[in-house]
Amino acid sequence: MDIYKFAVRPLLFDLVKADPEWLHQQTMRSLSWLSHTSDRTSTKWVQNILQKSLCIEDSRLEQNLFGLRFPNPVGLAAGFDKDGVAARIWSSLGFGFAELGTVTFVAQPGNPPPRLFRLPLDQAALNRMGFNNHGAAVMATRLADEKGLFSIPIGINLGKSKVTPLEAAAEDYLNSFRLLKELGDYFVVNVSSPNTPGLRSLQDASMLSSILDVLQKENQSHKPIFVKIAPDLEWEAIADIIGLAKTYQLAGIIATNTTIRRDGLKTQVIEQTGKAPQEEAGGISGAPVRDRSTEIIRFIWQQTQGEIPIIGVGGIFTPEDAWAKITAGASLIQVYTGWIYQGPMMVSQILTGLLAKLEEHELNSISEAIGLEFKS
């Protein structure tokens, strides 16, 4: 029996009605403690228990992409470990990679609370966090102390500081990249969060090109750089970004961030505010984004004949959800909201399910499943 799903989650969500952000903060405190006391005998014992319970090791799940070895294709999406305080623990929870951030050059508190809401009827979350983080310099100091101690690839998601005007966005991203470029295995240009005023306008080809240009000129170490896009973009805008990915030799595209659309939601009223989701600002993640993000993955694969790697994220709860994104063209996938709802067993359940899918389709490795929809 999945204790989290049938006992812990109902207790926290329904009986205690714990505030989602408070619950996240307590979780991060615990994970941070485990991460930073990993040399203690007691902590090693806990990590061994976690690894035996949550980690799946199988060579069929391994991939080598953009110079990095991924032990499995399931990663932690940005937004959970904003400041990299638990970077060393994610491998013990079964993840094949983890993306830290979003981090900005200037430390910022984010938007005023309440700013994180569960929509259980929709298996979704609504957030308007606003890139709350301690800043790139603090993250750099923390990661420098732990350099070489990570057993999985660690990505860093970069955002624009709220105080920085849009016309100075390129320099803002560059300043963060300069501090962190030797400390992350890959980097993500986040221009798709709906919670920083004007940020999504940076997805425009002319604005985005100025950011990518300065980053790649600084990128002497040839670190893989991705751009993360919104699910609300029109096909023409996505095609423009694909063109930029080719021009600036990006490692790939992450599809997708949260949506600002509210159609089709079952939730009528958000309990914390007494308002309908349509009246609340922020982006929605989870199941409502699932189909659209997969459509965009499919579009990118078709437009590029699979030449640009895709990290698929949005509404992944089950092995079937993961398989759909991989066969549509995603080389890797990321989870966040699904992990909150399904609990820590979810990663191992997805990986076990993916192995079953490989056997069902008589495939030797997960890489053979990428874009399987389009292979005869």
Curated annotation (Swiss-Prot):
It holds the Pfam family DHO_dh. One of its GO terms (molecular function) is dihydroorotate dehydrogenase (quinone) activity. FMN binds at residues 78-82, 102, 157, 190, 228, 256, 286, 315, 336-337. It comes from the Bacteria. One of its GO terms (cellular component) is cytoplasm. Monomer. This is Dihydroorotate dehydrogenase (quinone).
